[in-house]
Amino acid sequence: MSNWKNSVDPAVDYLLPIAKKAGIETAWDRYEAMQPQCGFGELGVCCRICWKGPCRIDPFGNGPQRGVCGADAHTIVARNLIRMIAAGAAAHSEHGRHIALTLLEVGEGHAPAYRIKDEQKLRKIAEKLNLAPAGKDIRQVAKEVALASLDDYSRQKRNVPCNWAKETLTAERVDKLAELGVMPHNIDAVITEIMGRTHVGCDADAVNLLLGGIKGALADYTGMCLSTELSDVIFGTPKPVITQANLGVLKEDAVNIAVHGHNPLLSEIICDVALKMNEEAKKAGAKEGINVVGICCTGNEVMMRRGIPLATNYLSQEMAIITGALDAMVVDVQCIMPALTSVAECFHTEIITTMAENKITGATHIEFREDSAVESAKKIVEVAIEAFKKRDKRKVNIPDCKQTAITGFSAEAIMAVLSKLNANDPLKPLIDNIINGNIQGIALFAGCNNPKAIHDNSFITIAKELAKNNVLMLATGCGAGAFAKNGLMTQEATEAYAGESLKAVLTALGKAAGLNGPLPLVLHMGSCVDNSRAVNVAVAIANKLGVDLDKLPLVASAPEFMSEKAVAIGTWAVTLGIPTHIGIVPQIMGSSVVVEFLTEKAKDLLGGYFIVETNPELAAAKLVAVIKERRRGLGI
């Protein structure tokens, strides 16, 4: 790997040599030590589902072509894939359940740390779910919405689809998915069904297995959608906010607390409590008090709603500790590296776990519960202040790297900006500019980071090329983090990289929104669960045009995808009719049936399909070609 550049993030480039000199192992070191990775696993042809195995299929056709039970490569690859989808759906949907249960507690008056911050949105959701909120007390509406959402985890009638899936998609798409038998009726049941059908001696038809995976991906979409919408009700719907990103947001003279993970229930309270405990931090010697920063999707949540600076994204989370300036990293669920505690041992940093089902050996555990949220947050901040007192100033190396980032573009915020140009028909300016070609299409960037690609590079490279081709870009998750850290969520990026017609549209919208300049080149829509915000925008456009989602000049890209959640997201994007690029070779190449289904046959069946391309320049060209193909289909 001598010619391999690990990252385009200057903060990472600054800190990696420091880590190496100190003998601190990072994700990049562990990835290199893992080479060569298992070829059977890379192809998806290793089966560990029963203890007759593990069984490995010879991809060259010379050795075993079936496992001990007789499962062939197609069955093995499909089973492995849809189990990943089930895990991803479980992760997102458990997040959603947590939010829904908290909303129920708010409605019942049992969660004093939380309140309803967006009553208007709550009533709109109630109307969407056919709950007739008019004239009802807001707490009653909260209870009814929460219970209707929780129904999506418990409904036993298989012919009644999940509320949040049925009411948020186009009618044509709902009908198509129902005809295919893949509309979920119950998130938990669908995940259970996947685990059951992939047990030894069950479903052995690759295509049938994949259809089960598609159903699981739609369950994931359901859980994500309700997570986002109900979080907005409790914490407020994001509006444009100017903040900063990258590790330069850490401060030498402050108690630095990073919130990391995915669940805003904890991080929001940490932010509140930190403000109230500023004086305690100053008494401990921190001249600037407490500085809360974000990492990963929890970071995106508080960045969108509060303007809390984003320190970094998934792959570089260890770098926050290696600065020597981080006093506490408070983690909840998902995408938290177990290695954090090992890195923290080299510094004074406290790694604080907070969820009963997510502990890490070597971390300090402070249990978080909604009914005692403030008390838990106070304990956490106190631990951070005590850690600050132990900080070794000789080890502090904060890179001088931070970028301005304009974030907070929820679907509602985008509509509010558009309404400045046409209050009676906010979508008209957007649709008119798509039809006349000023905006060629829309691209959603999502997903993770992966050391198999140069950190952040594919996001940046593809975005610059799409911008040149006048494609409007949205972003979520660690992809959004890449853009924020590398300066693509600024007005200057729009001036530098946008094609002339896209630049003109973004400038008109930015000035109308009072930004005294264009909107940023990439619009930050939130965390990974907030991919559903992009669906809301797409569905609104499709309904306005009278077409289904698979006709829109809309694409998605996850150029550095890594997690099982990303597998689920990509699958539901394809299922909704969105051509979806992935920049990491998926672990399915051992089955021609699975590859053909996901990259070709899905196009005929669903309208969406996967585009596998590891070269970001070629990926950008392919996405532009897809957008042009879709435009021709619409006759524009």
UniProtKB/Swiss-Prot annotation:
Binding site for [Ni-4Fe-5S] cluster: 262, 297, 335, 448, 478, 528
Residues that bind [4Fe-4S] cluster 1: 38, 46
Subcellular localization, as worded in the UniProt entry: Cytoplasm; Cell membrane
Database matches in SUPFAM superfamilies: Prismane protein-like (SSF56821)
Main location class: cytoplasm
Family that this chain belongs to: Belongs to the Ni-containing carbon monoxide dehydrogenase family.
Protein name in the entry: Carbon monoxide dehydrogenase 1
